[in-house]
Amino acid sequence: MAANCERTFIAIKPDGVQRGLVGEIIKRFEQKGFRLVGMKFVHASEELLKQHYIDLKDRPFYPGLVKYMNSGPIVAMVWEGLNVVKTGRVMLGETNPADSKPGTIRGDFCIQVGRNIIHGSDSVESAQKEINLWFKPAELIDFKSCAHDWIYE
């Protein structure tokens, strides 16, 4: 995969969906120049969420996190572009919204860490694992955007 074809998994959590922030979040990723290659609106099962957050299973907040993520619909997405994992994390802001800068998604729209509206893969390896967990290969659309040559050299 070429450098500008790196992929990341981004999920708008139930609070982000309920607060009507889906369009604003998608807009920010599109305006940055990233390409949406997969998206689904789902009510994730407890089993899927436990698998997604398996690395956190021994943390005291884990049961509450799974319950919160299972409390409503999620918009699961795969975005593609140059350094999309790292840049996507910068766009999201810190996990704790109180530490997030204005202009980031969490800095602009969140107050508490337990309701931080969005998840983003923290590494290329995590992104691949999360994408494979949430999407079948046929659900990811491979295409070249007309804007590609206006974004990349």
From Swiss-Prot:
Gene Ontology cellular component?
cytoplasm; plasma membrane
The tissues where this chain's protein is expressed are given as: Highest levels in the liver and kidney with lower levels in the heart, brain and breast muscle.
Where does this protein reside within or beyond the cell? Answer: Cytoplasm; Cell membrane
Keywords linked to the UniProt accession: ATP-binding, Cell membrane, Cytoplasm, Kinase, Magnesium, Membrane, Metal-binding, Nucleotide metabolism, Nucleotide-binding, Phosphoprotein, Transferase
What GO terms in the biological process aspect are recorded for it? CTP biosynthetic process; GTP biosynthetic process; UTP biosynthetic process
Q: Which residues form the active site?
A: H119
Picking any one GO molecular function of the record gives: metal ion binding
Q: Which family does it belong to?
A: Belongs to the NDK family.
Q: What species is given as this protein's source? A: Columba livia (Rock dove)
The protein, known as: Nucleoside diphosphate kinase
Which cofactors does this protein require?
Mg(2+)
Per its UniProt record, what InterPro entries does this chain match?
A: NDK-like_dom, NDK-like_dom_sf, Nucleoside_diP_kinase, Nucleoside_diP_kinase_AS
This chain's function reads:
Major role in the synthesis of nucleoside triphosphates other than ATP. The ATP gamma phosphate is transferred to the NDP beta phosphate via a ping-pong mechanism, using a phosphorylated active-site intermediate.
Lineage, opening ranks: Eukaryota, Metazoa, Chordata, Craniata, Vertebrata
Under PANTHER family, the record lists:
NUCLEOSIDE DIPHOSPHATE KINASE
Please tell me whether the keyword Metal-binding is annotated for this protein.
Answer: yes
Q: Which residues bind ATP?
A: K13, F61, R89, T95, R106, N116
User: What Gene3D superfamilies does the annotation carry?
Assistant: Nucleoside diphosphate kinase-like domain
Which chain positions lie within coiled-coil regions? none
Is NAD a UniProt keyword of this protein?
Answer: no
Quickly give the catalysed reaction: a 2'-deoxyribonucleoside 5'-diphosphate + ATP = a 2'-deoxyribonucleoside 5'-triphosphate + ADP; a ribonucleoside 5'-diphosphate + ATP = a ribonucleoside 5'-triphosphate + ADP
Name the Enzyme Commission number(s) assigned to this protein. 2.7.4.6
Signal peptide residues on this chain, from the entry's feature table: none
